[in-house]
């Protein structure tokens, strides 16, 4: 995203009708817009005070009435002068007010904001770092209470502070290494007297703890896609209804009732889970019509995109050759849980049986026996841990950076393991790996970040944020 410092304006509230709508303006020399749009009868707006006023056209006709709030730089969201006009939340009146602001700001070059540009300016003006900026959009998009709490942690700077603490520790260790390299004549045994290995091990342990928390937080953000697959009439739709707690899928005794995907989003321990019910799988030649055949094709397409496959089986009937053929087509890289349904008919009790290659759980979707076992095993399978600690709503780029930093620290540990003189090349390599680890961690908060990445991140925001 190329930075254009011209003043910007946008509607800051969500599209649609509401009780209140906000038009936001940010940039230099916006006092002319205040004078032109706000009928304050000569009184100046006091910074950070709400002033009730009419919003007017150039001819003095009233567009709307509401509150005008002026934030003087640097005490604003963007770090620039900001004007917020809070009026009624109708889309037409808000568009009229925005158009009036753009007309009044022609002389100062006022233009429409790009997606995420207000937050981008906040980042450039050091009002927040990159991880906090991502926390803004994660908080807006949070689909569960747990995800919202974790996003709030990132927005408040908790994640950034943790990363900065790691960076500071690596920096201190680098300073000792560089000093030893610069003054070899002192003949200091750096690795022993500065306890470099001990410091490095402490950093590695701290980084691993952060990675664990971030990985858990990523589950809260990205959620999980679970596909229910199996032969017709084994209870896939009944299981979807049991997990959802309502009748979201049609259930009948007729095999092949489900003809297309049915998707329902639920929560398990605060993790958003997309449960995808699919058409029953059987040989295409046995399909009753073209619609069922297409439904079976879509089932296999859904299976390929799953994070976890739940293979539904009939506990009352037992395993069949058709079940084995279905298993043979499952992708090898996707974990599979085998759920034996209808234990209310078979005489089985709710149970879980973990085998080397798969997990078998016995349930009844109609009377909900074994459902807690199923939910718990799903969490275990995806690596969810109840740590009791605050989680960071990490993104994929955060996890990649943390993993890369970990790898560089591992290489540094290997170089530090050599019993060598201070001037040995291994110490140079030790210092370089520390530098690279520090750089990877700093990319999380935006200290070392390419313009291309910034453009991608902020383009995902809404226009007025």
Swiss-Prot record:
PROSITE patterns: G_TRME. Binds 1 potassium ion per subunit. Homodimer. Heterotetramer of two MnmE and two MnmG subunits. GO terms for molecular function: GTP binding; GTPase activity; metal ion binding. Keywords: Cytoplasm, GTP-binding, Hydrolase, Magnesium, Metal-binding, Nucleotide-binding, Potassium, tRNA processing. Its cofactor is K(+). Its EC number is 3.6.-.-. K(+) binds at residues 233, 252, 254, 257. The gene is mnmE. It is an enzyme of class 3 (hydrolase). GO terms for cellular component: cytosol. Residues 223-383 form the TrmE-type G domain. HAMAP family: GTPase_MnmE. Belongs to the TRAFAC class TrmE-Era-EngA-EngB-Septin-like GTPase superfamily. TrmE GTPase family. (6S)-5-formyl-5,6,7,8-tetrahydrofolate binds at residues 24, 84, 127, 465. It is found in: Cytoplasm. Mg(2+) binds at residues 237, 258. It comes from Janthinobacterium sp. (strain Marseille) (Minibacterium massiliensis). One of its GO terms (biological process) is tRNA methylation. This is tRNA modification GTPase MnmE. Gene3D superfamilies: P-loop containing nucleotide triphosphate hydrolases, Probable tRNA modification gtpase trme, domain 1, tRNA modification GTPase MnmE domain 2. SUPFAM superfamilies: P-loop containing nucleoside triphosphate hydrolases. GTP binds at residues 233-238, 252-258, 277-280.
